[in-house]
Design a protein with these regions (language model features):
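DNA-dependent DNA polymerase catalytic subunits
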Residues: 1-183
């Protein structure tokens, strides 16, 4: 399976998934360049992609899986999978014009560390874990806002689903729109 490049109808030779069968008949999935293999996607996205591709390759029902996955995400049943883990490659003060979400989360974390009398952790780079909330990115250690589940559906689940569903003649919105309680 070679999903199309987003915004195009052409596949990418560096992004694919396949079902490999060895001489003994043992099956294993192979992922290259997809969200499963990338470190900048959440565990939610990786688990969803693996589950969806596995069902498609096995000829198992996948529509119910997509609907249930979206529903359980919105219901807060997958909160432990919503964590972004990103590396800060520069000092925090080096981010001026373009401030990505992980930098915003790191600044909030260090402000929190200042308030509680702990040393700052992120001024010189490092790894940050954060979630997307209704007030933007917030670090795990000081999250106060409600999780933005719609962000995870729109930015993590939908792109993966559409990259697999569109070649099959379906799409995420159509599949889930019959489930009024989702949106």
């Amino acid at each position: 399976f070679m999903p199309t490049i987003r915004g195009s109808d052409v596949g990418s030779k560096k992004r694919y998934a396949g079902l490999s069968v060895d001489a003994a008949g043992n099956e294993s999935m192979i992922y290259r360049g997809l969200e499963m293999a990338r470190s900048d996607w959440t565990p939610l996205a990786r688990q969803f992609q693996e589950g969806l591709l596995s069902r498609v390759f096995q000829g198992a029902p996948y529509r119910e899986f997509i609907i249930e996955y979206a529903h359980s995400t919105l219901a807060g049943k997958k909160d432990d999978l919503l964590i972004y883990r990103k590396r800060l490659r520069h000092r925090l003060d080096a981010y001026v014009a373009n401030v990505p979400p992980q930098v915003r989360a790191a600044r909030i974390a260090d402000e929190y560390n200042d308030r509680v009398g702990r040393p700052r952790q992120y001024q010189n780079g490092g790894w940050i874990q954060y979630v997307m909330t209704r007030n933007g990115p917030e670090p795990l250690e000081s999250r106060r806002s409600r999780i933005d589940y719609e962000h995870y559906l729109a930015k993590q689940i939908k792109p993966i689903a559409d990259s697999i569903l569109i070649p099959l003649g379906e799409d995420f919105v159509t599949l889930t729109s019959s489930q009024q309680e989702l949106f």
